[in-house]
Amino acid sequence: MKSKPIAVFTTAGSLEDARKLATTLVEQKLAACAQISEIESFYTWDKEVQNDQEFRIMFKTTKDKYKDVEKAILKIHSYDLPAIYAVNVDELYKPYDDWVNESIK
């Protein structure tokens, strides 16, 4: 039985770091695909509001791969406290879902 599709997100401080994360997880078959977008983030750190340019990486994978994806991100991430979260995908075009599952076997 196929595992449920999820999208896992994290951010990186540079395009180089984002590309390293994306390439590594796809090469390790932890994600079928990774997409990188430039974003502007606002957050509180050390009791002060921060504003940084970052790169969001979205990994297309399955629920049964989440823990391995999280471990792989933590192993190479440059942040002390990276945001790593998953979103369930309730509906997905079946041929694409098949491709995701096949790509991470």
For each feature predicted by the language model, list its residue ranges.
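Positively charged, small/polar-rich N-terminal and surface patches that mediate targeting and assembly
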Residues: 1-105
